[in-house]
Amino acid sequence: MLALAGAPLGLEFTFLEPAEGASAAQVGRQLVGAYDDPRLLAQLAADSDLVTFEFESVPESSAALLSQSCPVFPPPRALAVGQDRLLEKRMFQSLEIPTATYAEVGSNSDLVAALDQVPVPARLKSRRLGYDGHGQALVLESGELEGAWVELGRAPAILEQVVPFERELSALSVRARGGEVASYPLVENHHEAGILRLTLAPAPGLTPELESQAAALSAALLDQFEYVGLLAVELFQVEGRLLANEIAPRVHNSGHWTMDGAHCSQFENHLRAGLGWPLGGTSSSGYTAMLNILSVEPDPAEVLSLPDAHLHLYDKEPRPGRKLGHVNISGPDPIQVTTQLQALARALSVALPDPAQPDSYWPV
């Protein structure tokens, strides 16, 4: 999607990707090999004017090595923090960004100390390699913690208090090389088995106070890293306050709605930021519902029978829980967007949350 956004700007792309025949190879040149292959990294640097990443499992060491030869954005330091939940939590604390109570777990003695600091119910999360709900275990009673840690392979982890949040939001901001910052509207996210299924943009019922909190914490993070590119911050709303859950230093699934519902998509703005070009408009052009396609591809004709639907398929091999594409339903009328979303959900056998009003997810 980055390459598709860059093509009209005259940009050409080379991808480093281990899987042969990846869908990205349709829109650029693919180097097939491991993300830490020194020879391929050297070739990528030689072939590129600048390098970015859209996958958090890229080794930070590879990004740092590339940065010695050509500009890399977002900064490798942000990638390192985004890959480690403990570093992430410590960073939130250092910037006085509210977050859930947590404790480090790295030894048997830490298990006892963690239960003194974090009330149950809590969630044990591996420090690294957690994505779409992986690397987590729910702890309902204190006696379950050791078993949960064994379940995670005794990997370094954090124990985090379960937050009784009202909803999950995402704040997406982009910062250019010259320091220019632009922010998209806050969006509301809904998950299915730990995987993002639905994003509503803008988030229904936003208040100036919520928008101000999101802008302040995003600005603190962007400044902390001297950031370049798109940064997503996943947030919990709790009684009018925002708690930071995690950062994603890359273009983000909850920003895919911008392809059809914003004046400039997150993908184009990410590229503009890295190139030092002026940023595009980030305001929404109406109301958008983004529905992820999981596990099985739909009939394109059925999806596109909805007048405001935009179908984006990724040409990936279907498997359970895999994101195969997404549909954006975008328009100026929140009732029409809601009606078409409900029709799409019925066609795909997707369970949707109940709308705030009988006929609309947004106030009318």
Locate each region found by the language model.
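ATP-binding N-terminal substructure of ATP-dependent carboxylate-amine bond-forming enzymes
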Residues: 1-87, 109
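Anion (oxyanion) recognition and catalysis
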Residues: 7, 45, 66-67, 93, ...
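Active-site "cap" helix and flanking loop/linker of ATP-utilizing ligase/carboxylase catalytic domains
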Residues: 212-233, 238-239, 248-296
